């Protein structure tokens, strides 16, 4: 093993050469966290692995930022005053041939905003990502509600020698702004000036993964590592089949993402680094025998499963033995590895793990999503009927990841503004609202009833009331002498949402109506925001509620956390291994006559109650 000082110096140099470092060169960056994690994978079999001579590169998240303009505000915008941000925006506007930018920025219908997002490892040009928009301090803007972000450029910003430097354009951002107060169900002034554009960013670059080779490497050594990797992994494109590893220099190998691991890049890198560089048939037999013993030992099962997965189909028979173990951990790690080999035997165990053990749920859903076999589809379908909100929604998202055109999860676009899905479910009715990847509402359970309300609001212009015959009447208030448009529908969630859209409402208006209906006691279905599987959970044994003693600490899942469900704007670019714990929000029922006078909706409720 190399001395710590020389290894660290080598890593710094290689990161600088390859350009794979965080904006502020923090040693606690996401990439350095993963380097430390990967370095802990000791090799007990004596065979040299790819990971023994390489370090992964490109596993960090790139923060990109910019300044842009939100327009379409209903008198809630305003000038931000003189600042470097304002000067930058004026320069951007002039590059788009906008006339009189100074005058435009003073309009109450527009607002300067700071835009930011995160480019994940392995991102390709054209991929979408979520974007956050924030009104800067001292701005006169009071709300971004109903605003639309005009196309803005985003760059990586770095501080070098006490000076701010920006790179080339790394992303573009554009789309309707969803203010954070929509998800919080409040008129909070701060949340009104902060929001997000779901899937509104578009990457303008491709970030390849890579392996840096330790020590004084040669072209021949790099080629040998590439050949070992390509003997296990290859991809198919319009030019035919090719290996995923491409030696670029004597100390650097570029690594393409294998399609099976597109939602779990960190696992992919760990499997690649678990490939044997050179191994005779006799050595392979001895190593697999050793790995079988380790697989059946719960404390060593996770790493053994990775090495067996790296061997490939030739090791599947050993992983199948793991499915018969009495240990839930051994069964899970064996099934997870088998899933990435697309073995149907994995599906049943993974479905059980997702439904019953929260610490394994995140990984099990991602593994099922990667499988092509119909057994995985059936397992995910069954999970749509379990009580857990995060399991049901996680199964839905996994099914969409497998095949977005599947009639079960295809849904429809309402008003061109958000995706709408109605899923048959035998569990209690639930409505899920997304705040990541795309505007999306999913009804779990058909014909969900709405108790005709005295009144509730969908935005500030649409009111919903019950009729004498038990239906719903929706009215959109307009200015002037023209008659207010109205819609009448059955007292169910599905037709109510469609009526809101017909009256010109969008995602924000629908989400507000659902919140008010739930809080007012007009909905039996629970309304949940961002119910996704969570990291940082621990497995306590067969009884997850059983407290463990200091001598028997809970077991944290050893596998790298996949990205299929991560809300990156909530994590501030941290790796999912280190991100803080947060739970999905469930909208609770509160009395409809709540006399809150601090918000617009509270004042309206009190007015109608008189």
Model-derived features: positions:
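Structural detector for internal amphipathic alpha-helices that build alpha-solenoid repeat scaffolds
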Residues: 301-311, 321-322, 331-343, 351-352, ...
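Bacterial N-terminal signal peptides that target proteins for export
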Residues: 1-10
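Predominant activation on well-ordered alpha-helical scaffold segments within soluble catalytic domains
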Residues: 90, 226, 230, 266-269, ...
């Amino acid at each position: 093993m190399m001395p710590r000082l020389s290894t660290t110096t080598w890593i710094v140099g290689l990161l600088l050469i390859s350009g794979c470092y965080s904006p502020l060169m923090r040693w606690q960056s996401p990439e350095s966290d993963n380097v430390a994690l990967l370095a802990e994978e000791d090799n007990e079999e004596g065979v040299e692995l790819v990971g023994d001579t390489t370090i992964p590169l490109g596993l960090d998240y790139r923060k990109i930022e910019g300044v842009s303009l939100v327009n379409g505000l209903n008198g809630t915008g305003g000038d931000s005053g003189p600042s470097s941000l304002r000067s930058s925006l004026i320069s951007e506007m002039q590059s788009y041939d906008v006339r009189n930018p100074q005058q435009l920025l003073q309009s109450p219908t527009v607002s300067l905003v700071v835009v930011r997002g995160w480019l994940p490892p392995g991102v390709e040009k054209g991929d979408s990502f979520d974007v956050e928009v924030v009104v800067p301090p001292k701005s006169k803007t009071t709300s971004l509600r109903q605003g639309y972000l005009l196309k803005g450029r985003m760059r990586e910003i770095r501080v070098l020698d006490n000076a701010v430097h920006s790179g080339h354009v790394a992303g573009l951002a554009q789309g309707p702004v969803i203010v954070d107060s929509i998800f919080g169900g409040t008129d909070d002034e701060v949340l009104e000036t902060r929001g997000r554009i779901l899937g509104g960013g578009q990457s303008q670059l491709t970030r390849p993964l890579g392996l840096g080779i330790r020590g004084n490497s040669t072209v021949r050594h790099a080629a040998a590592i590439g050949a070992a990797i390509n003997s296990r992994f290859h991809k198919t494109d319009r030019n035919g089949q090719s290996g995923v590893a491409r030696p670029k220099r004597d100390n650097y190998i570029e690594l393409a993402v294998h399609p099976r691991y597109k939602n779990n890049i960190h696992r992919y890198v760990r499997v690649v680094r678990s490939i044997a560089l050179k191994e005779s048939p006799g050595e392979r037999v001895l190593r697999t025998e050793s790995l079988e013993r380790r697989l059946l030992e719960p404390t060593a099962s996770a790493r053994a499963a990775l090495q067996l997965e790296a061997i490939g189909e030739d090791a599947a028979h050993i992983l199948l033995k793991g499915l018969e173990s009495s240990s839930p951990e051994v069964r899970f790690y064996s099934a997870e590895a088998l899933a990435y080999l697309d073995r149907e035997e994995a599906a049943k165990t993974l479905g059980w793990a997702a439904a019953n053990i929260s610490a394994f749920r995140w990984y099990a859903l991602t593994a099922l999503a990667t499988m092509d076999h119909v057994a995985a589809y059936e397992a995910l379908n069954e999970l749509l009927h379990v009580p857990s909100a995060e399991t049901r929604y996680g199964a839905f998202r996994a099914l969409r990841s497998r095949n977005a055109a599947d009639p079960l999860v295809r849904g429809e676009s309402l008003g061109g503004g958000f995706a709408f899905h109605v899923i048959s479910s035998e569990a209690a009715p639930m409505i899920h609202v997304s705040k990541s990847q795309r505007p999306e509402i999913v009804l779990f359970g058909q014909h969900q009833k709405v108790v005709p309300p005295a009144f509730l609001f969908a935005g500030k212009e649409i009111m919903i009331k019950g009729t004498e015959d038990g239906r719903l009447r929706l009215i959109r208030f307009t200015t002037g002498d023209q008659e207010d448009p109205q819609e009448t529908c059955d007292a169910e969630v599905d037709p109510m949402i469609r009526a809101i859209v017909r009256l010109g409402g969008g995602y924000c208006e629908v989400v507000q109506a659902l919140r008010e209906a739930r809080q007012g006691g007009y909905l039996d279905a629970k309304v949940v925001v961002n119910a996704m599987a969570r990291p940082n959970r621990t497995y306590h044994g067969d009884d997850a509620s059983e407290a463990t003693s200091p001598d028997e600490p809970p077991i944290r899942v050893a596998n790298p956390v996949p990205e299929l469900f991560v809300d990156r704007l909530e994590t501030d670019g941290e790796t999912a291994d280190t991100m803080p714990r947060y739970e999905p929000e469930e909208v609770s029922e509160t009395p409809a006559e709540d006399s809150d006078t601090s918000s617009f909706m509270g004042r309206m409720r009190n007015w109608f109650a008189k």
